[in-house]
Amino acid sequence: YHYLAESEKAAEHRASVAAYANLDGQEKNPGVPTLAVWAGRCGDATCSKPERNMPGAENVTIPNATHVQTSTSLETFQRMFKFFTGKRAKRDIRRVSKKSTIQLAGKALEFPQNTGLIGDKVEIWPLSSGGVRTTLKPIASISITDGSEGGGAWGPVTAKPYQRYEFALVEPEGKTIHVYMEPFVRSDYDIRLLGSAAISNDTGKFPKSSGAVTIRYKELWGNEPGQNDELLINGLEICTASLCPWSKEVNAYFAINWEGKEETTLKEEPALSSLPFIQAAQVFIRASEPPSEIVSYQLKSRTGGALRTLNIPNWEGTKNQTEIFWNDFDTPNS
């Protein structure tokens, strides 16, 4: 809104914009043709009243959706595509052959500053279904040389579809953030690998224990019977009603040994949990260097699809941190 209506060159900016989509944000019309998309669920930190409306815009509400889900959902994409092109989006369910290759690329960024992780190295390792590296060397090792805002570019790297990969962010001082994602089914040029002081400082405070932050850009719900997400670590449900109420809008869940105890209590960590979109709880995962066990992370989405599993080594947390990214879209059961 500021860019189109309040900035020094607002009139010039409006003249260059044919149409604009406002995703569950403020309610003032920016002065260009606008699609205003609203979350159907309101009453949380991101919206003050459910009857939101932007005068003069095409207003659309996504039923039973929360804030971030509204930005990433299929329903929102369909409405945006129609608004921008005048045509209905056709769903392409074709998948690339397992024998073909895909391209992977993106940025390595410090969160939330969005600056490139200059000096870090991105290593890409193929994994077995059990989460173990299958090669002696990474298929790619790329130094990050651009530390500017929006920098940190890496790739493209030739890879295989349906193959699991680990993206290792190796810091100059020797610490590593191990990033795990679900297998890619097509080329992706917008993979964000995130470094963060919170991740480095809070997931590895105590030796001989491991921790992880699990991220999905669709809120995790735990207090809505019949439409809850299941988020499991070694079979333990961590997305409980008290830790994942829908109004908390949990996108990032820190399962960490913040108390320094060899037990899992799911006690809420106060500092991280006070932040929007974040939850953190006491979870003890035994760890060693080198890893000696496999940890099972699983997700069953509230909106359908099969139970998903990512098996990951029990990296020792003082020098290794783990990030797990779940797709915001659902995988069919068949």
Show the residue positions of the predicted features.
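Beta-strand-rich domain onsets/edges
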Residues: 81-102
